[in-house]
């Protein structure tokens, strides 16, 4: 009897609990508004879902949560739930909660749900005591009722057709063409002015219709075709970035001092040409002479027309030699540095004295070119040799000769050291070595271009007395007269050109005194296989005076023997 009565009592309580769950305000979870609560929060008397029941157990202090379908309730618990419920709990625990000002958390994030429950139950942020809960609830109800009444007092907007019915006559507006008032016309004019800047004004118009005419200033905006109408601007900017205009400039625009009408060019036939013809051959390497040396004469700034005529004569005489020998083209080197004794050929690196041009360059005969294949190189000695007195580049005198690097005085002694006079070897003229200069011809000497001794230097800048194909190892040469590079001929007379001064900063010492290792002299092999006297120094780094005169024509061709 007692068990059945107890069972009947539990069934009765369960039925009452299910009836309370079916109430409208209890159909959702009190904490997260999820439909179908399955647990009951016996601490506050609310109905919650499964996820919120776990969060409520983790609060401090933990809430007592019971399952609706898996537990039994006593009579006191049922009465407690009947007195509370979600509606009453909302008035107590969320009495001060404002839906518009307070942020509702995202209940899908468990961390945010836990923080919201702590604010609600632990901190009692929106808590209202039960005795004041009904008063606060009534105030909220009155406020919400007044707002609802104000909202309902606003008439509902309905279409005109629903008010007039289907039988309402059609209303036609602007059927005629009444005259417009001045106010309307002015407003339309203002609208047309604003229409140009209104991006949304043409949305309702026909996209295929012809556009309205615009003003001239607007039509010409960003119209690049109108740039051609400015004649003055085009004429001013016609030559902008036009590199062809540089070809019409004067001789000063020729970069690097390329020859113009007043300068001697690389080819004699272009001497009298215009600047345009010279620019046409610019970077055309076929127009350069077949020579391995650079044309320093083109950098001259005070070259006279007499030099140009001399160049033309030399090129005319070279026509026969070019057919006779393949190296005849090297004869143009004579046109660079020589134009006669005391010539007016200027230098780009200094000021030269002016004197009338003397004799014309003498060209070797055709017989010498035919007898020796290297005879065409005869004019190479005219670059570095002279029949007149040797001159120094930096010693001022009354008469001036030509020089490449500065003022060239004539007739002055190049060095204060003594120089011995004697016949030049192989009939060669006095030396034009830019590193060794002397007042007169001397006997045979070493061909080292860097050696400074007391003998008159006869070696040219690049070894005038050496052979073109040196026979320094005892091989007899096949030619009779050794010259600067090759060939057998008599060197023509030209003014000496000493380009660099003699260095006298170090005292000259006897042979072998400066370095003990190189103190011994070595036998010098002559171009004809003969050993010269022991007094000739063959060390290129020693400075000393010879012990005696050497036989004519006995000079070393190997600077390291």
UniProtKB/Swiss-Prot annotation:
Biased composition (Polar residues): 176-191
Positions where Phosphoserine occurs in the chain: 167, 181, 362
Sites where a glycan is attached: 367
Domain (Arf-GAP) ranges: 11-135
Effect of disrupting the coding gene: Mice have a normal life-span and show no apparent abnormalities. Females display normal fertility but males are infertile due to a lack of acrosome in their spermatozoa.
InterPro entries reported in the protein's UniProt record: Arf-GAP_FG-repeat_protein, ARFGAP/RecO, ArfGAP_dom, ArfGAP_dom_sf
S-S bonds: none
CDD domains attached to this UniProt entry: ArfGap_AGFG1 (cd08857)
DNA-binding listed as a keyword: yes
Chain positions with Phosphothreonine modification: 177
Residue ranges covered by zinc fingers (C4-type): 29-52
UniProt-listed GO biological process terms: acrosome assembly; intermediate filament organization; spermatid nucleus differentiation
Name of the protein this chain belongs to: Arf-GAP domain and FG repeat-containing protein 1
Organism: Mus musculus (Mouse)
This protein's encoding gene: Agfg1
